[in-house]
Amino acid sequence: MNQLIVRQLGVQPYEEIWHQMQDFTDNRNENTADEIWLVQHPSVFTQGSAGKPEHLLNPTNIPVVQTDRGGQITYHGEGQQVMYVLIDIKRLKAQGKDVSVRDLVTALEQCVVKTLADYGIEGYPKPDAPGVYINGKKICSLGLRIRQGRSFHGLAFNVNMDLTPFRNINPCGYAGLEMTQLKDYIAESEAQCDLVSPKLVAHFYNILGYNAQQIMCSQYLPVKSKSSEL
């Protein structure tokens, strides 16, 4: 039976978590449990592998990190719930589950759509622009990297954050794209990452066909230190 481990990492620097994802993916084997990492990042712009420098409109003192996920430039900051999914797609296929990379993208989008629905909000994906939108405004960005049939990176869901830095970029490469966040639609006391993240996780693992007995998230597990094995 596959196990899915959920780790709550709090607020962590982007580059440190990114390199830990790479190490985890490169060193896992066919018996390694899949994992979800929940994290918030201090202010940072990340440029995807297809990113074009002209989408950074106004250089600021916010660092820009060239990363290996798919997609263009986006912004991360505290109050944005990031959910990284480290899933062995190859193993799921070997077990008879017809899960493609496109299916994983859809699962990420739908877990956000379903989370929004929990709050009575109608969100939707766009076939030509990955992510989740509300009335044309983007509330969630996503980007993945697949290495040897295993995923890393994931989604970034705007919950209760300062959206101002998005004005310095063409978010995800789209000029004039307006961003939004959960706080704009519900009481601020409810728009908190620690309240939203369990909903995201539950919808995601249900969509992928995990069951409650497979999930180690009744208590969130901290990531181990860099000096020990993840």
Swiss-Prot record:
EC number(s) stated in the UniProt entry for this protein: 2.3.1.181
Subcellular location: Cytoplasm
Pathway in which this enzyme or protein is active: Protein modification; protein lipoylation via endogenous pathway; protein N(6)-(lipoyl)lysine from octanoyl-[acyl-carrier-protein]: step 1/2
Residues annotated to bind substrate: R69, G70, G71, Q72, I73, T74, Y75, H76, S141, L142, G143, G154, L155, A156
Active site per database record: C172
Enzyme class: transferase
HAMAP family for this protein: LipB
UniProt function note: Catalyzes the transfer of endogenously produced octanoic acid from octanoyl-acyl-carrier-protein onto the lipoyl domains of lipoate-dependent enzymes. Lipoyl-ACP can also act as a substrate although octanoyl-ACP is likely to be the physiological substrate.
Other notes: In the reaction, the free carboxyl group of octanoic acid is attached via an amide linkage to the epsilon-amino group of a specific lysine residue of lipoyl domains of lipoate-dependent enzymes.
PANTHER family: LIPOYLTRANSFERASE 2, MITOCHONDRIAL-RELATED, OCTANOYLTRANSFERASE
Protein name: Octanoyltransferase
